[in-house]
C-alpha cells in the first residue's frame, strides 16, 4: 500500500534546486503573482504554485479557495471570471490573479515548476484543464496534490508526467483526530493509488513513520514545505529531505 512509484531518473534534476513558495513574494510582490514569479526566475529559483479554476473555466494561479485573505473580497475564486480576477488588487499591490497560461509564457522553461492541483469541495475539472494547458510546454515541471483523485486523472491522461503526493500531520488537527482516512493519508498508505515519484511533506513531519519507511525502503525523492529560514533548511536536509520549498528568506543555491 505504501509503495511509491518506481524511481524515474527524470526526477533527479528536481532534487538539485530550491523552490520559491508561490514565487519570491514580499510587501511589494503578491504571492502567486507574475511579479513574484518573475523575481524567482531572475534569481534562478524553481517555483511552487497553485492552480484552480475560475468561473469561466480558465486555469488561474491562486492558493486559497476564497478571496478574503488576498483580495479582501467576499466570495470564492470559482465565482469570478479570469478577467475579473486579474483586476483585483492582491495584498494591496498592483498584482492581480494571473492565468496559468500567462505564467507559462513568463517562465518559458527558465526554471522548473512544482504545480499544485487545488480541488476544493465539489470542484472538478482542475486536473483535466491542467493537462490541456500544459500540453506542449517544453519547460521542466512536476505536479502534486493533497488529493489522490487529482493525481489519478494525471495518470490516466499523462502517465509520463512526474507526480507527487502532498501530505502533513493531519491527525494533529482537531478536525481530523480519529479519522481513518486522514490517518492513511498522513502515513502515505494510499500511495498505491497514485504511485508518486516524490513526496512533498510538511517540515515538521520528518518523524512520521510512513515517511521514514518510504525514505529508507524506497529512496523516494522527498521535498519539504514551507521552510522559512536557513536554520530550518539545514534541519530539513539533516532529516533526509532532498530539497525545500521556501519563503521569507533567500537560500544559498
Residue ranges and their predicted role:
Residues 1-253:
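Phosphate-group recognition and catalysis centered on beta-loop-alpha active-site segments
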Amino acid at each position: 500500500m505504501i509503495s511509491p512509484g518506481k524511481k524515474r531518473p527524470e526526477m533527479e534534476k528536481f532534487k538539485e534546486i530550491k523552490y520559491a513558495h508561490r514565487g519570491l513574494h514580499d510587501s511589494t510582490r503578491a504571492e502567486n503573482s507574475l511579479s513574484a514569479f518573475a523575481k524567482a526566475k531572475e534569481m534562478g529559483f524553481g517555483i511552487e504554485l497553485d492552480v484552480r479554476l475560475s468561473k469561466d473555466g480558465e486555469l488561474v494561479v491562486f492558493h486559497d479557495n476564497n478571496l478574503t485573505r488576498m483580495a479582501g473580497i467576499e466570495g470564492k475564486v470559482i465565482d469570478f471570471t479570469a478577467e475579473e480576477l486579474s483586476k483585483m488588487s492582491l495584498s494591496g499591490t498592483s498584482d492581480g490573479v494571473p492565468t496559468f497560461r500567462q505564467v507559462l509564457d513568463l517562465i518559458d522553461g527558465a526554471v522548473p515548476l512544482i504545480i499544485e492541483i487545488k480541488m476544493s469541495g465539489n470542484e472538478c475539472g482542475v486536473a483535466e484543464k491542467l493537462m490541456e494547458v500544459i500540453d506542449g510546454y517544453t519547460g521542466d515541471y512536476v505536479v502534486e496534490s493533497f488529493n489522490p483523485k487529482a493525481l489519478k486523472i494525471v495518470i490516466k491522461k499523462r502517465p509520463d508526467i512526474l507526480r507527487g503526493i502532498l501530505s502533513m500531520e493531519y491527525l494533529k488537527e482537531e478536525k481530523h483526530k480519529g479519522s481513518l482516512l486522514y490517518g492513511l493519508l498522513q502515513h502515505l498508505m494510499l500511495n498505491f493509488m497514485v504511485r508518486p515519484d516524490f513526496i512533498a511533506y510538511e517540515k515538521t513531519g520528518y518523524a512520521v513513520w510512513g515517511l521514514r519507511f518510504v525514505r529508507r525502503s524506497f529512496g523516494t525523492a522527498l521535498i519539504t514545505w514551507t521552510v522559512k529560514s536557513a536554520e530550518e533548511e539545514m534541519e530539513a536536509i539533516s532529516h533526509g529531505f532532498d530539497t525545500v520549498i521556501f519563503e521569507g528568506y533567500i537560500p544559498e543555491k
